[in-house]
């Protein structure tokens, strides 16, 4: 949610930002917000005037009563009652204007960083950098489910019976490898100075609207029937929600957090759920990183966060690249974002395994997260998030890049302590 002062002072900037996102259907929101803001400020000004009149008349009534002028006092009392009624009506209007303004403001996208490349959708995202040499094997790399089945590590048929499409049973060495990756990711981030959390896996609707756009809510979130609770789509949701209605002191910034959670997603939209695979599913586990920092530091942290993910994958010898998300692919709350993609030897192309985002003050403004500098002045901090690793999607890249011609899979040195010292499976 953008600052209302920005909208008042530079509405053309807001309109241009909407145009760059190819969301011209949202242009009317700017005028709607300006009109509601005008009406609300007029109502506040009128209410302040009425309160001053009421207070003045109330003092006058006291003086008249002391002088025994009851009839004059009664006439003024009626004026006060009339003012009270008008004031009550105005306060009702104020509440309506404020609620309407907030609803409109929540739909206006965050102002993007000028460096975000122009583009309509993810097909126009721009490659930033590549890390590692892509593997081109001289033997066939099977589909990831086939690799897992040969290693007796997955049961999709049983999952379909219990839960439907988009779920899986992992077992044996594959389940152990899955856990090893997450344990290594936890320790990797702790070693980089991040505080480890296991957060709540359900959050209230107030937090949901604070951390994501309406479109993301509809496409992602599962709501618990009969409860004001929603299953999280990523631990970022509950980790940012942790600071709702909080004022952080200067010495508490930056907050550098890493969190583990299962993630639950409806995956409504163009891509949908795979019938036979673990790339796009309803339930998975993830290690996340979250930062709350001073506004002037957020771009520095943005660079650090995506580099953490690149470094993590490179310790596992998985080639990766980073892609700058274009304006049309950027979610409404994001200032700038990039995807981290891993190399698929089977497909001979990269595929997404994580996403790093700087959300500026959008989430903090929605959730009333504030900070106080050394002089006691308040400001709104910035929030960022990034995927460390999200198996089983990451396992697709790992298995393909470490599959041997004999069907076994090498265990990277970094993972061997979490796999009982084993050097390969299969």
List where the protein language model places each region.
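N-terminal alpha-helical targeting/anchoring segments
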Residues: 1-134, 149, 153
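TRNA-recognition modules of translation machinery and tRNA-sensing kinases, especially anticodon-binding
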Residues: 130-426
